[in-house]
Amino acid sequence: MKTMQFAPTRRSFMTGIGAFGLSLGAFGVDLAPQDAFKGKIAGRRLKIAAIGCGGMGRGATESLISAGCDLVAICDIDPSMFDYWEKKYPGIPKFTDYRKMLKAMGDKFEAVQVGTPDHTHAYISIDCMNAGKHVYVQKPLARTVEECELMLKTSLRTRRVVQMGNQGHPGVWRYKALRDAGVWGEIKEIYSWSDRPIWPQGMKEYAKPEPVPSHFAPDSWDCWCGPSADHGYSSAYHRFKWRGWWDYGCGAIGDMAVHNADPAFWTFALGLPTKVQADTFGEGPVGVAYPKKSRIEMDFAANQWIPNGIKLVWTDGGIKPDMKSIAGLEAYAADYAAAEEARKAKKAKKAGKPYTPPAKVDPLVPGNGLIIVGTKATTIGGSHAAHPVCIAGDKAAVAAAIAKGDAASKYSHYREFVEACLANDLEKCGSKLSYAAPLTEALLIGCVALRYPGEALAFDAKKMCFSNNTAANAFLKAPKRGAWDFARL
């Protein structure tokens, strides 16, 4: 396979951030909070259309409306998703093919919310950018590295704003404050994990095709598949269960590392890994689906924040950091477990139900989190850049720095997008494309490693390819199927 030809986009991006963090504006570190934008767009609301309006798409659309958007049209391949919106907005225009919506109503809206499965994020987003629309797209940004690069290239060419939906991103200001205060000391290790998957994974073969639901339009399933392979309609794919399949989702790491590891990537300008290695705990390479549980180690090159480089360890499927190997974690886990039991007792009492506490409460590490181990302090935080706490080191210094970060974090994830679109400023959003693309790419490189458990894959960020496994490079490429070819966009 030929080397991926993404270097011009990547080089221009790397130049813009000063080679991994020497000027961190492009990573969002020095972004002004929302107050800096006030007064520029008073009274102006953004007109949007929703593509994928159930599940996360529904939640994101409602949040965008609350943040200053007017919803003018909705689109979903599954018409059963329309009922909710019809009750709220009687007579709102409805479509089952976003391309028909663009053609019929493209002059009626300025931006789109893309809340479809992972494998169609990039194609729909690029098509909409080419049609002049700003894009709010769910996480992960795309399913392959090439798709992320194509999105970045299209945004720069069309000057359309793109924001990725990692909704907890405003919380990274706390981590910036911790970094700037120097309370961690030198960063030694980073751990991030999730209790996902909560959907099927580990399948050995594709699902047996079922009849397409009678309420679907004739081309609805084709639209659902988009550029990815059509394995026939099945309830094992639609709805929700698509996440566990290689061709349609990004597994647990794609679903949750975008949230849980976000503060580490942003705060330390990690960029792309130089080496990745995965462990699937004896499951071996799975042909059609992600493994049930995994551990992925990612090595990142040195920069001004991590002068000796760093290893980030991601785990999922119930695999959590070892309590005994991280200072302070076992004591924290004991307190967390006790608090969980107290919460259960309170909930039972409120419901008027009896509650019998266990004879012994074992230490419990939360289901999702991020641990940053430094020479001076260690912190643990929850999902979506949740409030970190000190588990080892100077707790007062950590608390003071976090309070400073809280004071700086005054903006809304969704309002940022609205104001960026109205100002036509690609860099106003915290989770803007120049940050979201490399973040997602790093995780997708980890996804590829899951196909080669036990093998250390070296990644060349300049050439955007694996340097020691040519076959693995095929999984970095964007798919194409019939008319759904990125080359036509």
Regions found by a protein language model. Name each.
Residues 2-21:
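N-terminal secretory signal peptides and thylakoid transit peptides that target proteins
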Residues 15-42, 289, 420-489:
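C-terminal helix-rich "cap/oligomerization" subdomain common to oxidoreductases
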Residues 17-89, 168, 264:
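N-terminal Rossmann-like dinucleotide-binding module
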Residues 50, 114, 137, 162-164, ...:
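Hydrophobic residues in well-ordered beta-strands that form the structural core
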Residues 72, 110, 188:
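Conserved acidic residues
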Residues 92-150:
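Beta-loop-alpha module in the N-terminal Rossmann-like domain of NAD(P)-dependent dehydrogenases
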Residues 134, 142-218, 222-223:
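A contiguous active-site-proximal alpha/beta segment in oxidoreductase catalytic domains
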Residues 217-415, 419-425, 429, 439-448, ...:
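Glycine-rich, aromatic-lined ligand/substrate-binding cores of catalytic
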